[in-house]
UniProtKB/Swiss-Prot annotation:
Superkingdom, natural source: Eukaryota
UniProt-annotated stretches for the region Disordered: 1-44
Source organism (scientific name): Rattus norvegicus (Rat)
UniProt-recorded name of the protein: Alpha-parvin
Domain Calponin-homology (CH): 95-202, 262-369
């Protein structure tokens, strides 16, 4: 640091008194210049630090290890594109999720004579999504039934997705699909969309928990295609999302005591057969034989000692809707008998959810176990 020269009392004053102020002025200028240079150096260090951080984030970028579709290689400099890792498609949980969603769509659209076989190939143009939403929402959309050109397809898809987003009422950052991604047959976007629809409309299906998909992010840098992989979560805890997250004794049995679970199942089978045998009916599989609601309705009549008129329910239901109506009717009979409203949804029983079925039957057992 520059300092001013000390004055000696025995030395006469300098004949050039302006020199010291000039030196001070120079020192001041150098100080300011030094400060400016220091600030610039600090700013450069910050910039380098930020760049280092960005490089750390992008460190996983590496040459692509699998063959890309020719369309996916047509990228502009620094353009980014995402796609599903081909190896990830074989994941059993992902395969299960896609099958559950395909079966659900086909069941909803059975009256439309539409059969979906591949989610990306069959949903990208908006036709199936239109019919699915119209059926779920009971609302006719003002869109063209058939579209051939890409422009017409995207216009239709835009209208359909706007209606879906309005119904779901999701915050913008939670919407993980758009016209371009769906029309580009982006499986991740389509899965996010279908999962959101199934949960909002409380579809009678059980989605597998914690399904993730390996996504490859491709970017063009200095003329070279590079990629990195990320895990994209499609479903989390589906029970918590559907409001069925309160754990009870059956959660514990399923998770930690499968041997005791079998004892409970045998006890309940003995209980229901004790009464259903009076009608020459017998149960061997709890989750499947109560799924259409018929045995539940008949069982309630036997336990309460009355005859349920056959016109009050569907004796041979042939659709999900009729099965749900049967189970809902049985739930009403249970409440009429003094039981609380069952915690499971009728759709859970129809979907052969064993845990839900056991909860309902166990409530009946605790109230009616001494009934002959």
């Amino acid at each position: 640091m520059a300092t001013s020269p000390q004055k000696s009392p025995s030395v006469p004053k300098s004949p050039t008194p302006k020199s010291p102020p000039s030196r001070k002025k120079d020192d001041s200028f150098l100080g300011k210049l030094g400060g400016t240079l220091a600030r610039r150096k600090k700013a450069k260090e910050v910039s380098e630090f930020q760049e280092e951080g960005m490089n750390a984030i992008n460190l996983p970028l590496s040459p692509i290890s699998f063959e890309l579709d020719p369309e996916d290689t047509m990228l502009e400099e620094n353009e980014v594109r995402t796609m599903v890792d081909p190896n990830s498609r074989n994941d059993p949980k992902l395969q299960e999720l896609m099958k559950v969603l395909i079966d659900w769509i086909n069941d909803v659209l059975v009256g439309e004579r539409i059969i979906v076989k591949d989610l990306a190939e069959d949903l990208y143009d908006g036709q199936v999504l239109q019919k699915l939403f119209e059926k779920l929402e009971s609302e006719k959309l003002n869109v063209a039934e058939v579209t051939q050109s890409e422009i017409a397809q995207k216009q239709k898809l835009q209208t359909v997705l706007e209606k879906i987003n309005e119904a779901l009422k999701l915050p913008p950052r939670s919407i993980k699909w758009n016209v371009d991604s769906v029309h580009a047959k982006n499986l991740v976007a389509i899965l996010h969309l279908l999962v959101a629809l199934s949960q909002y409309f409380r579809a009678p299906i059980r989605l597998p928990d914690h399904v993730s998909i390996q996504v490859v992010v491709v970017q063009k840098r200095e003329g070279i295609l590079q990629s990195r992989q990320i895990q994209e979560e499609i479903t989390g805890n589906t029970e918590a999302l559907s409001g069925r997250h309160e754990r009870d004794a059956f959660d514990t049995l399923f998770d930690h005591a499968p041997d005791k679970l079998n004892v409970v199942k045998k006890t309940l089978i003995t209980f229901v057969n004790k009464h259903l045998n009076k009608l020459n009916l017998e149960v061997t599989e709890l989750e499947t034989q109560f799924a259409d609601g018929v045995y539940l309705v008949l069982l309630m009549g036997l336990l309460e000692g009355y005859f349920v008129p056959l016109h009050s329910f569907f004796l041979t239901p042939d659709s999900f809707e009729q099965k749900v109506l049967n189970v809902s009717f049985a739930f009403e009979l249970m409440q009429d008998g003094g039981l609380e409203k069952p915690k499971p949804r009728p759709e859970d029983i129809v979907n052969c959810d064993l845990k839900s079925t056991l909860r309902v039957l166990y409530n009946l057992f605790t109230k009616y176990r001494n009934v002959e």
